Amino acid sequence: MRTTKLLLTLIIGAVCQFVPQLGHAQDINNFAPVVVKTVPEAGSQDVPPGEFEVKITFSKEMADQSWSWSTAWENSGPEFIGKPHYESDHKTCVVKVRMEPGKTYGWWINSPKYHGFQDPQHHPAIPYLFTFKVKDQ
């Protein structure tokens, strides 16, 4: 009798684990956005100095006026020239910056503390460390 109850409990437990997965199909719209491309390419070491358009492209459309460019360390962000904006695809955020020769820059595109980059359903983008180095003169 005890063996039958134990076996029945194990079977019910195993079935219950799979039932929620069958009832809820995965939908890309419910996933958090991720960075899929950067300009300059993350890790680049030959970015030209001076004015430059930095672009961050996400895996899905993003909410307008929603971003959080957090410095990765003290003074790690270049000087912004103007305000960030999204291109017409609503996936690519662009900001014009001024960069100094020979300097390494880094941002967190979202972070544990700041999560302004969000899709229209308010899913914050997965934090992404974006670093690059500017060429010497």
Residue ranges and their predicted role:
Residues T9-F18:
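Bacterial N-terminal signal peptides
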Residues Q26-Q137:
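Acidic, low-complexity Ser/Thr/Gly/Pro-rich repeat segments typical of extracellular/periplasmic
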Residues M1-L8:
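Bacterial N-terminal signal peptides that target proteins for export
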Residues V19-H24:
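Sec/Tat signal peptide C-region and signal peptidase I cleavage site
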